[in-house]
Amino acid sequence: MKKAFNLFDVTLRDGLQTSKKIYTLNEKKQLLHSIMNNYNPLHIEIGSLVSKKVLPQMNNSMELYNYAVEQYPKSNFYMLIPNIKYLKEGVNNGVNNFSFITSVSNEFQKKNTNMELYKTKNELNHMIRYVDKNCNNPIKKLYLSCINECPIAGKIENIRIV
């Protein structure tokens, strides 16, 4: 029987990106070992390829990804990719499992990515085509933010989601 859903550990990406502390690569490796030894998740979002100035917490994400793939070959490691520039970097460095993000709220999308929703949709389409063309059996997942309410614009009308 096929699973209806997969669980993802996002500690090393979502958990660290809001931290005031900037973790070293060795500290991130220790966190990875702790997660693997205690929980052994099959799917892990290991980091994000973003500007080091915008999110210094995600520094060394590519190095951590490569380390994780080598150390734990039975797990699936994902990288959150916000745009085509960082997608090309990820593909060129062997990333094959991708997390993408968009929003239902134009206001949230502009604040989060500096792009309007229509531009984000075009960018995502371009990114997915790029992955399909340049990777062998890539796995892609999409985060959809603000499906009920936006912290900036308030309640989201259900018709916009459909």
Specify the residue positions occupied by each region the protein language model found.
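Conserved N-terminal beta1-alpha1 strand-loop-helix module at the mouth
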Residues: M1-I46, Q57-S61, Y67-Q71
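Short, well-ordered coil/turn segments that N-cap beta-strands
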Residues: K2-F5, N40-L42, Y72-F77, G94-N96, ...
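Active-site mouth loops of central-metabolism enzymes
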Residues: F8-K29, S75-I84, Q109-E116, C146-R160
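Non-cysteine beta-strand/loop elements that form the S-adenosyl-L-methionine
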Residues: F8-V10, N96-N106, K140-S145
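Conserved, mostly hydrophobic/aromatic
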Residues: G15, I35, G90, F98, ...
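Glycine-rich, proline-tolerant flexible connector loops at the mouths of alpha/beta enzymes
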Residues: P41-A68, T102-E116, C146-A153
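Alpha-helix-loop-beta-strand connector modules within alpha/beta enzyme cores
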Residues: V54-M79, K119-K141
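Catalytic cores of alpha/beta
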Residues: P82-V95
